[in-house]
Swiss-Prot record:
This is Uncharacterized protein MG012. Keywords: ATP-binding, Magnesium, Manganese, Metal-binding, Nucleotide-binding. GO terms for cellular component: cytoplasm. Residues 115-287 form the ATP-grasp domain.
Length: 287
């Protein structure tokens, strides 16, 4: 019998979209006759030797973004899915776009990387310098995002310089600034990739918000990718070094897909609901 450890962050439990994630995995494991054992990140004591850790096998499905913990597990010989490198590549949105920029055939949103301000307030002079750089690089409206964030949080639409300045002044962490894709307002495509294979795609729309996150009230329906689009999603998962992920695309003016961001800890519950299938089955089968 295949045995897999699952490590998750209990801090996410109150979030409604994540409540059924463990149950989804349990249901899949029963169907596949796979033994799963669940651990929170707090259950792992990094002062202990490998032999004293409570794991049932060498494989760990790591449903957290704790890069240091993932790296520690890898250093002790565990196979961690996703790897610490993959999580790091995808969790930092600025780093994700820097990696994708190495591949010109992957169309992505025009993205300006903000300076690292080390959780300090903006120096007024440097804020002016950055705003001028933004204005020289793209026209309003623009999107300001924290390099870290999920569920559409810490994402702001700035219609003019006044809103941009106010938004940046409220940030105490690194941000990226992106051209606003007006033709894709409240609309995106989420593609789920497991082990270099597309296992599902959703078209999400939100009529009341520029963000198309399901957590922000968006609706979703199955989206059918053509072969070229499938290959694009798989290529992105490969260059990001991810075993499984959710890749978000926007629509360009010609309705082609343009890379937005990638989630290394994609939540399968709502996607499974809209696709009427348990996506965790494909994930566990692939491990």
């Amino acid at each position: 019998m295949k045995k897999i450890n699952v490590v998750y962050n209990p801090a996410f439990n109150p979030i409604s979209s994540k409540l059924n994630q463990t149950q989804l995995l349990k249901n899949a494991s029963e169907e596949l006759d796979i033994e799963l054992k669940f651990f929170t990140s707090f259950d792992i004591n990094t002062t202990k030797a490998k032999a004293n850790l409570p794991f049932i096998s060498n494989k760990i499905l790591f449903m957290d973004k704790n890069i240091a913990l993932a790296r520690w597990l890898e250093s002790n010989g565990f196979e961690v899915i996703n790897s610490s490198i993959g999580i790091n590549n995808a969790d930092n949105k600025g780093l994700s776009h820097a990696i994708i920029a190495q591949y010109p055939f992957i169309k992505q949103i025009k993205t300006l990387l903000g300076p690292q301000n080390f959780d300090r307030e903006w120096n007024p002079v440097m804020l002016d310098v950055f705003i001028n750089q933004i204005k020289q690089s793209m026209e309003f409206p623009v999107i300001v995002k924290s390099v870290f964030g999920s569920f559409g949080d810490y994402v702001f639409l700035c219609l003019d310089e006044q809103k941009l300045r106010k938004t940046l002044m409220s940030f105490n962490q690194q941000a990226i600034v992106q051209k606003y894709i007006t033709c894709s307002k409240g609309e995106s495509v989420r593609v789920i990739v497991v082990n270099n294979k597309v296992i599902g795609a959703l078209h999400t729309t939100n009529n009341s918000d520029f963000r198309s996150n399901l957590n922000k009230g968006a609706k979703a329906e199955r989206f059918f990718l053509n072969k070229e689009q499938e290959n694009l999603a798989v290529k992105i998962s490969k260059v990001m070094q991810l075993f499984y992920c959710g890749i978000d695309f926007l629509f360009d003016q010609d309705r082609s897909l343009i890379f937005c961001e990638v989630n290394p800890n994609v939540q399968l519950t709502r996607s499974s609901m809209y696709l009427n299938t348990n996506l965790a089955i494909e994930l566990l089968k692939a491990i």
